[in-house]
């Protein structure tokens, strides 16, 4: 589980599923399955937010010919503060989902052999609900932004990150 600080939930759930098999818990209760799935969705959201907004967005928002001093997350914050802010908030939302389902934002212990060690309380669920639609809208907005960027210069993206090896 402590192999990675970006995707510890994936490692945690893989370990829990391995132990499930060892102890003969081939089926876990439906609620536990949903909590584990929600935990993993939180992981996916926060991990993808880090990847896109902090690591990849400079390449999509600025040309490759842009200076390295500008084509980075600081440049995104300067030129596209709303996009940068959304990335931070999307990641935080994903981490809150993890915290509520796994006990901590990083290296949680929510999945145990045969299920999970707690359910999501009504108060915890209600904590997540108000921002859910906004988070989904921001995700859709990024897809629109990528589509616009691609359509403006498909050749740029056709060979993006491809390296001829022989």
Language model regions located:
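Active-site bordering "gate/hinge" segments
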Residues: 1-166
């Amino acid at each position: 589980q402590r192999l990675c600080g970006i995707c510890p939930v994936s490692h945690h759930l893989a370990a829990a599923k391995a132990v499930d098999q060892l102890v003969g818990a081939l089926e876990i209760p439906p609620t536990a399955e949903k909590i584990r799935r929600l935990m993993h969705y939180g992981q996916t959201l926060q991990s993808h937010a880090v990847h896109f907004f902090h690591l990849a967005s400079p390449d999509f928002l600025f040309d490759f010919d842009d200076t390295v001093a500008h084509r980075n997350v600081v440049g995104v914050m300067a030129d596209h503060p709303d996009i940068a802010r959304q990335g931070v908030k999307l990641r935080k939302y994903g981490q809150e989902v993890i915290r509520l389902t796994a006990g901590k934002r990083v290296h949680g212990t929510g999945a145990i052999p045969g299920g999970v060690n707690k359910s999501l309380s009504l108060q915890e669920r209600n904590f997540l609900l108000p921002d859910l639609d906004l988070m989904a809208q921001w995700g859709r907005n990024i897809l629109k932004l990528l589509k616009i960027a691609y359509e403006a210069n498909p050749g740029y993206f056709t060979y993006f990150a491809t390296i001829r090896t022989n």
